Amino acid sequence: MNAEFQGRDILLQQLSKAKIIYKQEYAFISIKFKIEGDIEPYPYHVRVPVEMRAFQQSSAPIIFLLHIVNGIIDELEIITADSAEINTDNIEVERVEYEINQEVIVKNNS
């Protein structure tokens, strides 16, 4: 996670203790996380704290949505903006854009 937002380090800790359940269908990929062991819950009541769009040269952007449920990292949902089939072998991540939920934006105190 290259984007900076409040609680990011908590989610990274949760990811380090997660088992991954991968599911792919035509136009989406679901990466579910099952957390094992004790973890610090994400303290913000935001379902999707960060979204990433990866712009592709020959197709619509691919959108990555990180879902949090009850303070626990739950799923990384990956979809195409035009509902086309996702080719996991050719996802380009050279040009990405992040959208941070307003509730968890890191505010500068300058």
Cite the ranges covered by each PLM segment.
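N-terminal domain-onset segments
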Residues: 1-47, 88-110
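Amphipathic protein-protein interaction modules
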Residues: 33-86
